[in-house]
């Protein structure tokens, strides 16, 4: 995590140095800011700069100062960074903002444990000792399909109700009884597919892993809009959630194709580039084309490219007016309950 520690007094700065050393040993990228030496810039302006560029802020000082500093920049818990507040003697570590999604609760516990302080966490699920779907999803790098429904899941569990959880991937440990109610009006699915949709009788919250590689091929200078429309159609046809796309893969001849670059950027996915010789080494049965081989030196780009990333085939080559897609996925994901 990228973390900034902000202190206001000499005592606070000394505590900040201890926190800095601890976080650095944990592999975080940490910056320390001493407001005694940076007082010319108004605090709100100063805090805003760090609020948007950090994963977490640690204020050492009064909670009121921290609240006033960050107030103008708050959006929601899915976008805001974690914000913690500590008193300058290090007695308390307060999880102030983005406890689950931002990781403030976990960071507060870690700092408190190592500094001999008390963690102050007020999130209902934590206080009641109830499983939190948003926190579990974040820890397992899963994206929530519906934020409102995630809140409803937590609300039901806090009220003592149970819901259903289904996973297309291996679960380590025993799934708690409160997640095994098949008669519940809410079900949680760990899936990269969109085929599970809510109905009036059943609400479906999908937890989406980022575990799909899409092989892509296209004609030279294919339009960006055309590529985007074709890919959206492909996602819909194959019932694949765009949030599950981890990477795109193609041949080096298409490495600088604007439409492919734009697609990878839109879906925040890596772009894997392979040579024709690389693609020839791919193992499996592929829908080869003599025409494609004449152009690229290999009979199939999209299927072969995706299979070099993940071995499990998800969809075969499909053509959308000169644009081809195929996909593979990582089936060996595991999720734990302890």
Ranges and model annotations:
Residues 31-33, 120, 270-274:
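General small-molecule cofactor/ligand-binding pocket signal
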Residues 232, 249-306, 310-313, 319-323:
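C-terminal non-catalytic interaction/assembly regions of soluble proteins
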Residues 8:
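Glycine-rich Rossmann-fold phosphate-binding loop(s) that bind the pyrophosphate
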Residues 29-31, 177-178, 311-314:
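Short secondary-structure junctions
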Residues 12-28, 36-42, 49-56, 60-105, ...:
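Conserved mixed alpha/beta catalytic, RNA-binding, or beta-rich assembly cores of soluble enzyme
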Residues 1-5:
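Extreme N-terminal starter segment of soluble prokaryotic enzymes
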Residues 31-34, 38-46, 103-106, 289-291, ...:
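Secondary-structure junction/capping motif
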